[in-house]
Amino acid sequence: MLSITQLWLDGGRLTQAPRSQITDTQNPMFGWTAVSDTDGDGQTACRVTVADADGSLLWDSGWQQQAAQRLTYAGAPLPVGQPLSVQVGLRSAGGEETFSARQIFYNGQRPQWEGCWLVPTQYRSRAVNQYRRRFAVKGPVRNACLYVAGLGYHKVWLNGRALDDAVLDPAHANYAKTVYYTVLPGLETQLQADGTENELVVQVADGWRHNDSAFVEQATGGRKIEFAGQPMLSAVLE
């Protein structure tokens, strides 16, 4: 009998780690790893279902007669920032069917960026700029997801707790043309929703946005770097 040992999302392992659960496309590719306890047995068909936070089906691939261990999503538009779930079913050469547990993933592809850019009123090279927002929430929060881009690098805390162990976010790019952002989903469990004040803190440091080291100056011959400038922050919490 076949056993599904691992699900994959866009070529990466889908695990409990939040970063592994993010897709940046409306057509993610799901993959899986399977083993069999019978010699010569293998996958002859597969089926993938995707559901929203309510359990409503967004896509059912139906049974596909194939040995390939991947399928590309081809269903309804995926909601952004909300928990979605995927399940994979396999059919063996002997006709036995097995299904994986449902696993959570998120679509982090925002169709439009609504956040404004914040810059420090006074700038000092190699200083860490700290932005703080306090807010109260009354009533249950169903879903909460933070999208944040701090140039050059940012670090985020919610109610005194670091939301991620990463230290080099966001990914580097030519900021004059492209800015990447970090997706931090599932924050509804960390918000105080009884009217008590929440505190969101983002620290932003120079990174590659403003690098005045002698090495960089020597490497560029003193010419101005296109993407250089003051550290900036833009974020959306919804």
Walk through the language-model features, giving the residues of each.
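Short, compositionally biased P/S/T/A/G/V-rich stretches that sit at domain boundaries
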Residues: M1-N27
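Surface-exposed loops/turns
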Residues: D24, V80-G81, D194
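Recognizes extended acidic, P/S/T-rich segments that occur
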Residues: D41-P83, A93-E97
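Terminal edge beta-strands and adjacent linker/stalk segments
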Residues: A101-I104
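Short amphipathic, basic-aromatic surface patches that mediate peripheral association
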Residues: T33-T38
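Accessory beta-strand-rich segments of carbohydrate-active enzymes
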Residues: W32, L71, S85, S92-A93, ...
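Boundary/junction segments of secreted and surface-exposed precursor proteins
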Residues: P111-Q122
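Short, isolated positions in well-ordered beta-strands
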Residues: L14, E97-T98, L163-D164
